[in-house]
Amino acid sequence: MKQGLSLTAAGVAVALVSFLPGGPAQADPGPPSVEAAAFRPIDTGDRAAVREAVLKRLRPALAAKVKWSGSVSGCVAGKPARSTQQATLKAVNFFRAMAQLDPVTFDAGLSAKAQKAALMMDAENSLNHFPPRSWKCWSKAGAEAAGRSNLCLDCTGAASVLEYMTDEGPGNTAAGHRRWLLFPFVGEMGSGITSGAGALWVIPGERVRAKSPAWVSWPTPGYFPNELDPAGRWSLSASNEKIDFARAKVSVRTADGKALAVRRHKPIAHGRPNYGSPALVWQVTGFALPTGTRSRRLDVTVSGIRVWNQADTALTRKKITKKYSVRYFDADVA
């Protein structure tokens, strides 16, 4: 049974951890570096392209068996098998490709620390971004990674990436796991995997320059497979750090104009970079996923978005409205 993906603790951890480059790799090199697959962005305007990506990129990654060489009883961190790391990386980069973001690589040093974090979570059968020294298999490197990683218990490898993207649960209304996975300004992550827990180092030591879309949403605009529906928890992030969602309003309508029920969560505020980019998260209910060859279009309007001035002293007069459409479809049907 999957445990909660504890974002509340993660949010606090992120707020308290400064953006400093990670320290040198430990003597144990940990899991090997895995180069990012050369995934070009997925054309979400093309149903066939999205379907092909789901069938050939995502599903094989999710089906990969989790293998690792460590031992919980012996507090041996070990390493994931290369095939397990590759599958996890492919899952991460699939979701980034759906959002038109650059792929990432897994850094060996970050992965070694994340591996020790995953070991602690598995050994203690619990999740904590501030694991106390009393925990089984505690290590300084593992504790550091715990504060910078997405954590999952009873979900590991590529399957944990899907859990992070869904980001269900009352403690995850900021969709932090998802938003860090889709953070535009990161080039390296680290992956720790045991048979019972996963730790994915997602918070960068420093931001990297990257081409990024102005907006990063989930679900993404265009064709979107039913199987990736995030249980109605939608999000919109801004690459521009000056964006302010404090008074933004959201509407989601069907293709015939029917308004769906929307519950807006507390926005991720401007000026809090340790929580990732400014963002708005909301819950959508009242629609059914399509079957057969049909698709179902949902039109999103986010209005009342404001922009801070360059000095961050006041909001400008500028107001932005962001509109986009999502077309759900069944990827099992050509």
Language model features: what each stretch is:
Residues G30-R40, K136-L200:
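A well-ordered secondary-structure block
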Residues L5, G11, A108-L110, P131-S134, ...:
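Solvent-exposed, flexible loop/coil residues
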Residues A64, L89, N128-A145:
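Extracytoplasmic/secretory soluble proteins
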Residues M1, A10-G11, G157, L162:
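Generic hydrophobic alpha-helical membrane-segment signal
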Residues K2-A112, K116-M120, E124, G187-E188, ...:
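N-terminal targeting leaders of exported, membrane, and organelle-targeted proteins
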Residues E124-H129, Y164-G169, R209-S212:
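Short linear motifs at secondary-structure transitions and domain/linker junctions
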